[in-house]
Amino acid sequence: MSLGILGTKLGMTQIFDNETGTAIPVTVVQAGPCTVTQIKTSETDGYTSVQIGYGDVKEKNLTKPQLGHLKKADAAPLRHLKEYRLDDVSGYELGQAITANIFEAGQVVDVSGNTIGRGFAGYQKRHNFKRGNMTHGSKNHRLPGSTGAGTTPGRVYPGKRMAGRYGGTKITVRKLEVVRVDEEKNLLLIKGAIPGKAGNLLSIAPSNIVGQK
């Protein structure tokens, strides 16, 4: 696995291909800057990884253990911490800044984040069930219909698709293309849609391509 970066979704826009004039839908992401807050090695932790922090926060909003952990890296108070497992951590040091320049245009990345929470939703909205007739004497408009058999088994099987909370879950959208990198402003323009609303916390990491390291 390669080192990724934490960022914030800013919104969507479109850019145009200089050669063909085709409109490309892109999501603008504020990628970092992040700070290396911990380096784990096989000798001390049993595996190798790099932990990074993102998002300035007031000191009073963190606990003393959290502040003590960040102080070891001489890092400012940071809201979010995330760890990326690596094969080799020799090129990183505590307090090192991680910015958008670790990516390049044309690179393929995986983006993780929380989807938009829609609250308690019904069958049509949550599972795309077909509704019943609205006229001709029908009394079944947006009801689920049968949820199972009768006496046997005499219960509803676990996992039955029913109404409930919809969205607000963490997902990963894989193999999205980085269209453009703005190193001065630490912006990434990623082709396509990304989970969540504007302001959502994201983790962006290089995709694992079969046959490549």
UniProtKB/Swiss-Prot annotation:
What NCBIfam families does its record include?
A: L3_bact
Q: Share what the entry says about its subunit structure, partners included.
A: Part of the 50S ribosomal subunit. Forms a cluster with proteins L14 and L19.
Its function? One of the primary rRNA binding proteins, it binds directly near the 3'-end of the 23S rRNA, where it nucleates assembly of the 50S subunit.
State the organism's lineage: Bacteria, Bacillati, Cyanobacteriota, Cyanophyceae, Oscillatoriophycideae
Keyword list, A-Z: Ribonucleoprotein, Ribosomal protein, RNA-binding, rRNA-binding
Is this entry keyworded GTP-binding?
no
Question: Which Pfam families does its entry note?
Answer: Ribosomal_L3 (PF00297)
Listed GO MF terms: rRNA binding; structural constituent of ribosome
GO terms of biological process kind: translation
What's the protein here called?
Large ribosomal subunit protein uL3
Q: Gene name, please?
A: rplC
Can you quote a single GO CC term? cytosolic large ribosomal subunit
Positions of the region Disordered?
130-161
Q: Which family does it belong to?
A: Belongs to the universal ribosomal protein uL3 family.
Q: Which InterPro entries match?
A: Ribosomal_uL3 (IPR000597), Ribosomal_uL3_bac/org-type (IPR019927), Ribosomal_uL3_CS (IPR019926), Transl_B-barrel_sf (IPR009000)
Entry-linked SUPFAM superfamilies? Translation proteins (SSF50447)
